[in-house]
Amino acid sequence: MTNNMTRDQADKIAASIRQKYSEVAKNPEGQFQYPTGRKGLEALNYDKGLIDKLPDAVASFYCGVGNPFSIGKINPGEHILDVSCGAGVDTILAAMMAGPNGSAVGVDIVPEMIARAESNLKMTGIDHARFQATAGENLPFPDDWFDVVISNGAINLIPDKERVLTEIHRVLKPGGRLMVADQIGAGSVQKDFEARLASWFQ
């Protein structure tokens, strides 16, 4: 493991992520220190024409920390992977941009989030997106498969960042793009693991 973290410690973090986000899958309102739902999408300057196409019930589950699409555009016909997709709002928006000749796949380790993402997808009627329960560190896709990989507020939660970035590089086509919106910690890192675990989501 990287960051001098043991496997048991990494497993504890994964369990805490599953616990928190299984609750977020029920209702993200009040779970974060920043705007969520349609207000979050608008505050982060997502394309109004796209977010207006989202049913309110889908938009309400947006809980990203930034706008990965502000980094670059998704072109029609491209194939996109969303790492740690949560409720799938960014995945769905990517599928809209890619159009019917493209595709979008969202992966997440939280089964409840995948179930929510699939429910959200059904409400949109989009048929060129799908979701899969898997970890970003073990992507079940061939080499050179995707044109774009996106991630929103998630890589910071993954203990083994070197491994997840290596996997992302593997599945990206040569010349592919990585578009990440995320947050970082400021100040000193807690030395005690239990204190680090308690502050993992702050």
Question: What label would you give each PLM region?
Answer:
Residues 184-202:
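Short, glycine-/aromatic-enriched active-site segment of Class I SAM-dependent methyltransferases
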Residues 34-79, 90-97, 116:
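Conserved alpha-helix/loop element of class I SAM-dependent methyltransferases that forms part
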Residues 2-44:
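N-terminal auxiliary segments of SAM/dcSAM-dependent transferases
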Residues 124-138:
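Conserved SAM-binding strand-loop segment of SAM-dependent methyltransferases
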Residues 110-112:
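Conserved SAM/SAH-binding beta-strand->alpha-helix loop
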Residues 76, 137-148:
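A short acidic, Gly/Pro-enriched loop at the edge of an enzyme's catalytic core
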